[in-house]
Amino acid sequence: MYRFKKAEAEAEFEQIFRLNHAVFAGELCQYAADSSARLVDKFHDKNLYVIAVSDEEVVGMIAAHDRPPFSIVDRLPDPGVLEQFGRLIEVRLLAIDPAHRSGMVLAGLFLTLYQHVRTYDAVAISGRVEECPMYHRLGFHDLGPPVRSGQAEFVPMALRVADLARREPRWRRRLESVRGPMP
């Protein structure tokens, strides 16, 4: 059973840092491994974190922020392409513990994020090349070619919040069929 919520407690943030290290340093080799087994995002102070919790353990998270500079700019051939989207929020990080990688966790994270981004025009993300089909199913569209970072390649993408709104009822039904009503 999963709970999806905005991260607020220090213990939740500590678990987020450990999950980030496991995924981005250990699995994707984007960052050097650290003896503390923690990875704090450079935009931590301005990030909104939504999390998936199972048995009081953070097993998935999305970190997003709405204040430039956006890291996606470094992955775009023409950063001006972002101007078409109006008010933008960037998903900086998406990490899910490998033992919990399922459509349900991803849908729950994005549904929870949606509750916090309804007033924006678009969501930007740099998605791993291997995960592009999943992002495309979510409604994201490529903004440029893949760009290497560490041992992974990322594709800059965006999704209009109005498109996310159209997908919300389907995600909500899927989650409620498994875990009961969502707030």
Ranges and model annotations:
Residues 1-39, 49-53, 58-59:
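Short amphipathic alpha-helix that is part of the acyltransferase structural core
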Residues 31, 67-80:
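A short, polar/charged loop-to-alpha-helix boundary motif
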Residues 36-40, 77-80:
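Short, P/G- and charge-enriched loop/turn segments at secondary-structure junctions
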Residues 44-46:
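Short, small/polar residue-rich loop motifs at catalytic or cofactor-binding pockets
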Residues 51, 56-67, 72, 90:
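Conserved beta-strand in the GNAT
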Residues 66-68, 131, 163-165:
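Feature marks short, surface-exposed loop/turn motifs that line or immediately flank catalytic pockets
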Residues 75-154, 159-161:
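Acyl-donor binding region in acyl/amide transferases
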Residues 150-178:
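C-terminal "cap" of GNAT-fold acetyltransferases
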